[in-house]
């Protein structure tokens, strides 16, 4: 993709009720200085969906990205996304996971050029006995980069949500700013949320933080 793309690029992945498995592989490359909006839409009836997305964002390029997963309750969605960000590039990503009996969104991002700016937001909504998994690996390979991960979850009935997130800072990635926060809200005593934020830092001049909260609605506040 070269230059500025004025209209969103939408990739729609749909499946029928034949119970088949699909394994689409998509590669996207933004040239230096390019800008685009990319959206994935996943909606399958029955079966396994295991998409693989590889994205390369060139120097001083910008990508706004969204992924919506709303497969049926009789399906499994196991997705992997890999991104490489060039020098001075900007990535704004948003993921939403609401469908599937089992859903896992795994995202690996490498900030391979200095002054790259990356924001990844995700939300999962679970009910019945759904299982949602958001896994991220943010790798700072060069210095003066910024990353921010914002994860939100809402769980009802016997649903379970899992967030596993890592920020890795290489020895040469000085002046890194890596932030990570996960918050989950439980609407049922049977719902469960697990969070495992991690920092792996090999540089000494960085600003990194992570945190996680899990809570219920206050009955008094609901009453009033």
Task: Place the predicted regions along the sequence by residue.
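Conserved beta-strand/loop scaffold segments within soluble protein domains that form the structured core
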Residues: 1-223
């Amino acid at each position: 993709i070269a230059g500025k793309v004025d209209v969103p690029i939408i990739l729609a992945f749909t499946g029928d009720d034949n119970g088949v498995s699909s394994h689409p592989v998509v590669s996207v490359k933004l040239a230096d200085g390019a800008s685009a909006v990319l959206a994935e839409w996943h909606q399958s009836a029955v079966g396994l969906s295991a998409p693989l997305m590889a994205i390369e964002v060139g120097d001083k390029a910008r990508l706004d990205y969204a992924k919506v997963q709303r497969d049926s309750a009789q399906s499994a969605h196991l997705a992997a996304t890999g991104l490489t960000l060039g020098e001075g590039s900007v990535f704004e990503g948003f993921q939403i996971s609401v469908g599937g009996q089992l859903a896992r969104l795994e995202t690996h991002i490498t900030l391979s050029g200095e002054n790259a700016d990356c924001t990844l937001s995700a939300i999962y909504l679970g009910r019945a006995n759904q299982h949602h998994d958001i896994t991220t690996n943010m790798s700072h390979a060069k210095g003066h980069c910024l990353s921010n991960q914002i994860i939100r979850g809402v769980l009802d009935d016997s649903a379970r949500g899992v967030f596993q997130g890592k920020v890795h800072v290489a020895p040469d990635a000085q002046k890194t700013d890596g932030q990570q926060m996960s918050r989950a809200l439980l609407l049922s005593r049977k719902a469960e949320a697990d969070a495992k934020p991690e920092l792996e830092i090999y540089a000494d001049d960085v600003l990194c933080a992570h945190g996680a909260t899990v809570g219920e609605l206050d009955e008094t506040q609901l009453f009033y």
